[in-house]
Regions:
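Core catalytic region of metal-dependent phosphoesterases/phosphodiesterases
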Residues: 2-108
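Single, functionally critical "micro-switch" positions that shape active/binding sites
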Residues: 7, 147, 226
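Activation segment
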Residues: 13-15, 58, 129, 153-155, ...
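A short, polar/proline- and glycine-enriched secondary-structure boundary/capping micro-motif
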Residues: 16, 129-133, 244
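Structured loop/turn residues at beta-strand edges in well-structured enzyme cores
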Residues: 43, 72, 139-140, 169, ...
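Conserved residues at the C-terminal ends of beta-strands
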Residues: 51, 147, 222
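Conserved beta-sheet core of the metallophosphoesterase superfamily
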Residues: 98-200
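Cysteine-centered metal-binding/redox modules
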Residues: 198-252
Length: 252
């Protein structure tokens, strides 16, 4: 059994295609491709933590039809677009097969896995539990996972602030649009946090993100793959040394 993380599938949400620059022609096409990529990645015995905004529709029949097709058990963290799903679960209106698929649902989670601790919220939480546990380097085993901000300037801002804090925030946006529309493994989440460590300068970190003198190449942090060319890597919020002169960036 493996565990996976994802967020912001937005099944059935036509408008999110343009918002994220998703490569789908319709909500129906998007649904089919999201299900296909999920099932290519997730085995039947796996557990997937979905961190909010599972579907735009609150119709129990629609929600059930999607859930029944997905591999694995789904442990939900509710997001701001999950009121319909929350209501359907509370009122027992999902099919029996779908109700079993949604194994558990909460607003916030903390899970231990392989000596690491994953904190999960739909919303990014820079001041997460354990953030300042610097003694015995415990904070290096704590990771804050979130969704909500998609591939937006807010995503870039949080990423920038996370890396150049001391100690660095270990915060990862697991939104599906950043990860090829597939749930990711704990190892992918951890590597996304740690790949920028050891940067000698802001410029080196930008080069690791694929941004050189020619500008943004459209890639992102670690394994991230941004889906929206209109935002791209660092386009929304470009961090430079003169913007934060009080931080010693030479040591990061």
């Amino acid at each position: 059994m493996a565990i996976r993380f994802t967020a912001d599938a937005h099944f059935g949400h036509e408008n999110v295609i343009a918002m994220d620059g998703r490569p789908f022609g319709s909500a129906e096409e998007m649904d089919e491709e999201l299900v296909r990529r999920w099932n290519e990645t997730v085995r039947k015995g796996d557990i997937v933590y979905h961190l909010g905004d599972f579907a735009m529709s609150g119709e129990p029949e629609y929600l059930s039809s999607i859930a029944e097709r997905l591999n694995g058990k789904i442990r939900l963290v509710f997001g701001n677009h999950d009121s319909g799903l929350r209501r359907a679960m509370r009122n027992g209106r999902l099919t029996a097969k779908a109700a079993v698929k949604f194994e558990d649902a909460r607003d916030y989670r903390e899970v231990r896995h392989d000596h690491m601790k994953f904190l999960m919220s739909h919303y990014p939480m820079p001041c997460y539990n354990g953030r300042h546990h610097t003694k015995n380097r415990e904070n290096e085993t704590i990771f804050m996972l979130h969704g909500h901000v998609h591939a937006t300037p807010e995503h870039d801002m949080i990423r920038n602030l996370a890396i150049f804090q001391k100690p660095a925030m270990q915060i990862v946006n697991v939104g599906c649009m950043l990860w090829d529309y597939r749930p990711i493994s704990p190892e992918q989440a951890v590597s996304a946090c740690r790949m920028a460590r050891g940067c000698a300068s802001v410029g080196e970190c930008l080069r690791k993100w694929g941004m050189g003198d020619e500008g943004c190449s459209g890639c992102a942090f670690g394994s991230y793959r941004l889906g929206a060319d209109r935002f791209g890597c660092m386009k929304g919020f470009q961090l430079t040394a003169d913007m934060i002169p009080r931080l010693d960036l030479s040591e990061r």
